[in-house]
């Protein structure tokens, strides 16, 4: 009797080694050795996919089909979550170009942005202006106005440059030269130079009201803002400035199967080296590949349709109910969250990409710049999001809620609340043109102890009309608290806003 034969009962009894079913029925050969645990896969596996059957490591046909359906579904969901920023930029480009061609069209919200504009979580106080930059073989010049916060992001939603107050022009305005992908030509002096990896690029800038008036910022843009090819610097084409305040303007991507078609449009338009090879590989695995038509068959379209549904529910969960403490300003003690928990505009933490943070941010907001990571006392802005009340229940537009801001709100410039539609993440559309308020609002009541009570509901509470923002019965909503010029008590958390409370 061989040594293996003598010890086999002991091995089986102690489960020290796994002998696949097929091998157990096979004759013991001269070269047979024990198989260390964890290497062999049992011929029958009970999983969330059901029973997976194999013959000594080779799945049967039914199992193979089941596994491939699952693999395609998994990759569809991950492609959705990891590419939502690409679809978002597709939506932005489409929304801008509906008003006119790239490079010569600028959209201006001359009397501010209201809820007719479907943009991701804008505010109601900045003077928004935007254009789409399309490069070809030569550099493009952008002449920028002073005193703005401006960003250029590429077609894959990656940072290209800042201009204005956070840019190299230091808020004075200037000439920027944007070099196209692969450009190796001369670069003239006299420009702030930036290189982009994509042909399509989003240009967005925010001006500031002066004594409550947006007109000075608008006038400076009309006078100074230009985009043109470098070869036309001596005779640049005229810009077409379009006032889109009060007009319907959709820049938001789809959340259903159509999101994959939107992502495909960007992949087809841009160089392959403009995006991470791993992500492009993930997209290729579901049929989105540069130079090839995206035409999933009936089976694959059904799988991707379900993947989009699960992806949509997943990213909405990431935004509304984050599960990690780092998304909460007061973990375990309050509902206020941040859509940007890290210190990197590339969503890096400890050398790793924080995937949920990237998905959450690009689902909820827009605009990428290193400046967003700055936490400067008395400068910039800070944002706190609430999707649920103090008990963890989603906001119901048919009910009334209250948020109390304790005295000495730590905002050097001003503070504001804005309400957003859970579905679109754009401003909530009500009878109020601007679904928000700030501390500069006329008639805003302050309590005797210096605190403020702000109300949210379908009807104004009697005596608190100036402190009220309207909601819509039958609809949910979420809110953003913004602090402009945030002060030290915000950062050290010695001051904190009250949680939204249901008013009974």
List where the protein language model places each region:
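A compositional/structural signature for long, glycine/proline-rich flexible linkers
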Residues: 24-504
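Residue-level detector of alpha-helical transmembrane segments in integral membrane proteins
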Residues: 2, 13, 27-29
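Bacterial N-terminal signal peptides that target proteins for export
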Residues: 1-9
